[in-house]
Amino acid sequence: MTEKIPAWVDGELAPVGKLDVHQRGLRHKAVSVFVMRGTDVLIQQRALSKYHTPGLWANTCCTHPRWGEDAGVCAVRRLDEELGITGLAPVWKGRVEYRADVGGGLIEHEVVEIFTAQVSGSLGLDPDPSEVMATKWVDIYELAARVTRHPAEFTPWLRIYLDQHLDLIFGDLARV
């Protein structure tokens, strides 16, 4: 795994190998996308081959931008690469930061640009099996309840998003 992502080293942003970032728990840039259909959100189950949190459910797309890559461009690129989703224009909702142990001695310490995209009707999906094992649409209220009942089935960042950033991500939907 030689991909370099933007991470802070000694207070300066620098390109650092992705695995090194997680082993050292470095603060780094990330992107998360939530594709919505009304009050339903598309979630993905991470492939078993992923180097951390394999088999756990996460939001639609969660990734790291390449060094020098715009967060919005990254969101569009990874929706296509992970799920085969094209033609969406994700809307930036805000920035959050979290730190979480993701197992295996790895730490996610992310500064995350959050995006949402609304769709109506069906959405053509073509998941990359090296990234995604399964997908499903879930009502955000049911998802929050499932995460509360079965937290071990979900990634730490999805649990954090739903617990601490529901209003930022889902806005008026979270207040219904």
Place the predicted regions along the sequence by residue.
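Nudix hydrolase/Nudix homology domain
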Residues: G17-L19, G55, V96-Y98, V102, ...
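A glycine-rich, hydrophobic loop/mini-helix early in the fold
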Residues: A30-C61
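A structural signal for short, well-ordered beta-strand segments
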Residues: V33, C61, W92, E113-F115
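The catalytic Nudix box helix
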Residues: I43, T60-K93
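Short, catalytically relevant binding-site loops at active-site mouths
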Residues: L48-K50, H64, E97-A100
